[in-house]
Amino acid sequence: MPEDNLYDISIIGGGPIGMFAATYAGMRSAKVQLLESLGQLGGQPQALFSEKTIYDIPGFSSISGKDLIRNLNTQLQQFNVDVYVNSPVLNIQKTEKNQFKIITNNRISYSKSIIISTGIGSFEPRRLRIANAEALENDKLFYTVNDPSIFENKTIAIAGGGDSAIDWALELNTIAKDTIVIHRRNQFRAMESNVDKLKESGSKIMTPYTIDNLSTDNSHNNLTIQLKKVRTKDTVELSVDALLVNYGFMSNNSILKSWDLDLITTKNNLIPVNSKLETNLQNVYAIGDIANYPGRIDLIAVGMGEAPMAVNNALESLYPEKIQPKHSTQLVKNIKNNENN
């Protein structure tokens, strides 16, 4: 086995939590690789919410998904981390040396420990289940927003009742001519403070309604949305320029089933971990939204705290004789001293 292909830590999943875990592992002078199945790092904030404003990142009153990932990438590049994108992990096997053989679609590597940070796994939006919806995608019907400017001075309908729907309604309300929020319940599931902002924003709120049909006129300029009021026969028609559907995302973590991990199958194959973020497999850790323990909540801020914990616990298990520096100042100073020697 070539030594340059053997890592102290392999991090599977290149979303924001995996990126910071790789950064911290590099800061600890570990030999580390970061494996990401998509063509770019960043996970959901980069692929799905690049223009969405995030308000619960420590140190930032607000930051867009793309800016968060850009900052994390700048931080990552300060340290010696091997990054592989377009590299979905197909299998993990235990070797006779009590190490891990990691097989991706394009290479084989070995690792002394693994940190899983796959989040919700591979994901795609929950789509409208009506006959002609697919034909309207990326024209009048959208599930993600890559460029908010296309909605400038337009009448936009946003369907959904969770955080994403309300966040986008507030965001687009600043540039759109009119915004209309459609939800099948009278109560929203989004953060209460944002729901209050929505009610004060001037957006039109249509509850409890479901989308029954979509159609366009001959010129294809306007989209007509037929709404049906829940538990009644009442219908309403809306004429808008575009519809943004935020019904959440379907995820797939089924690949984890082949890795001998204990999984909570009733919770989308989440991985139970202990207070050290250890899984049932020795030297395998889980962090971020894929990890499960009592009281955990799915916030980027929570995962950011788990990242250095998992790295430190992994290195302590591998190299118990090494003294762990307490502060990043000393860690970076040590790296610079080694580079100068």
Curated annotation (Swiss-Prot):
Q: Which cofactor does it need?
A: FAD
Q: Which reaction does it catalyse?
A: 2 reduced [2Fe-2S]-[ferredoxin] + NADP(+) + H(+) = 2 oxidized [2Fe-2S]-[ferredoxin] + NADPH
User: EC annotation?
Assistant: 1.18.1.2
- The entry's FAD-binding residues are 36, 44, 49, 89, 123, 289, 329
Tell me the domain of life. Answer: Bacteria
Q: What Pfam families does the annotation carry?
A: Pyr_redox_2
Query: What does the note accompanying the cofactor annotation read?
Result: Binds 1 FAD per subunit.
Which InterPro entries did the record assign?
Answer: FAD/NAD-bd_sf (IPR036188), FAD/NAD-binding_dom (IPR023753), Fd--NADP_Rdtase_type_2 (IPR022890), Ferredoxin-NADP_redctase_2 (IPR050097)
Which terms does the record give in the GO molecular function aspect? ferredoxin-NADP+ reductase activity; flavin adenine dinucleotide binding; NADP binding
EC top class named in words = oxidoreductase
Q: What keywords were assigned to this record?
A: FAD, Flavoprotein, NADP, Oxidoreductase
Q: Which PANTHER family match?
A: THIOREDOXIN REDUCTASE 1-RELATED-RELATED (PTHR48105)
Per the record, the similarity remark reads: Belongs to the ferredoxin--NADP reductase type 2 family.
Q: Which HAMAP family match?
A: FENR2
Q: How does it assemble?
A: Homodimer.
Q: What is this protein called?
A: Ferredoxin--NADP reductase
Q: Which organism is it from?
A: Ligilactobacillus salivarius (strain UCC118) (Lactobacillus salivarius)
